[in-house]
Regions:
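Charged (often Lys/Glu-rich) extended helix/loop segments that serve as interaction or gating elements
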Residues: 44, 56-198
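Active-site loop/helix belt of alpha/beta enzymes
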Residues: 1-82, 166
């Protein structure tokens, strides 16, 4: 938490802090999460600024603004069973559309998955990269072509860390109203990939 990080920062580098122009308190502060102690955050930052006036404090709330606001909806385009491993190939890519699932690793909740029982699946991405898959999901029934897979809470990194590796198509960005009406905000095409290459 920020309080312990700041305490360690001041203990190790307190003699240097007065010479700084700014200090970055980092990211990952889920200010919008239910139960987040905003009052503690505010008092911690105010106390720091009182001790070190004139230093600009930077805070990166980042994902807090889009946390639990965007799902990535995929479809199963093929299924394979080999050596006892069930694989469902999706029309999205873990490497291209959600690299945080491989780098961090962040394991998104899947709305259609079950916690226990069911059938274990490896979910494969649609790029040619050998590591473009995610394991550890279970489904109540065998997946079939056309089944919908909803990867929850994907907005915070999906839109900023994507790549169009080898022309992999990006998913559309859609706003769904409370009544279920969908409005397309952005549809990607080959021209988006082509413009990045020139």
């Amino acid at each position: 938490d920020l309080v312990s990080v700041l305490d360690a920062f001041e203990k190790k580098f307190g003699h240097l802090i007065p010479r700084l122009k700014w200090v970055n308190m980092g990211g990952g502060h889920l200010l919008t999460r239910q139960g987040y102690n905003v009052d503690l955050l505010v008092s911690t930052l105010r106390d720091f600024q009182t001790r070190y006036p004139g230093i600009q404090v930077i805070l990166e709330p980042g994902s807090a603004f889009t946390w639990q606001t965007g799902d990535l909806v995929a479809s199963v385009v093929d299924t394979v069973e080999h050596d006892g491993i069930n694989t469902a190939i999706l029309d999205v890519s873990f490497a291209c559309h959600m690299p945080d699932t491989l780098e961090m690793p962040y394991t998104p909740k899947i709305a259609e998955a079950v916690d226990a029982g069911g059938i274990a699946y490896r979910l494969g991405g649609n790029s040619c990269l050998s590591g473009d898959f995610k394991e550890g999901y279970r489904f109540a029934e065998k997946l079939k072509i056309g089944d919908r897979i909803t990867l929850c809470d994907m907005n915070h990194y999906t839109t900023v860390k994507t790549t169009m590796f080898n022309g992999v198509h990006h998913p559309d960005i859609v706003l769904a109203d409370a009544d279920g009406q969908c409005h397309y905000l952005r549809r990607f095409s080959y021209d988006d990939y082509k413009s990045r290459m020139s």
